[in-house]
């Protein structure tokens, strides 16, 4: 796992020096793709509703995979929670994380069996951070205390899924997924000024 720059930075996975372009990442059985760089940013997938992580190098024991997934040198498979409640009541999970430099990350998950063989679930999480950490700037004999600017992170993610089991041996599962990340890109640290206005927005 390679991290390019801490909070809000790109995080990729590669196996045995093949590079992130040759390491596939599947999300609930769907192999992901990135048209801009070819490298999947795994930081956008929170672990709050992940059921399992599986890394496969070479051949997969599952024969029901796509040709593109079978051609990958290695595959990181991310499987989300898909349990079926024993009753028909609504089950709600909520949590909130807080940290330094304005970090706030709430998470909520709803799941309910609405019929004997039909289950609905919804998941949403949001992450906000200012990332204005302090640092010292040395300019000859002058030392000033500055704060990182233009480093705000503002991302949200939501999923709605339906699972239908016509019998004990078969399952039909559909999901709607949305991701939106609007973040600022900090520039280099300059003397006398630290103004930077670059932004990046990713929507999936």
Q: What do these predicted ranges mean?
A:
Residues 23, 49, 86-92, 97, ...:
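Outer-envelope beta-barrel architecture signal
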Residues 133, 145-155, 163-165, 169-204:
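Flexible loop and strand-edge segments within Gram-negative outer membrane beta-barrel domains
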Residues 11, 72-74, 90-92, 104-108, ...:
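Hydrophobic, lipid-facing positions within transmembrane beta-strands of outer-membrane proteins
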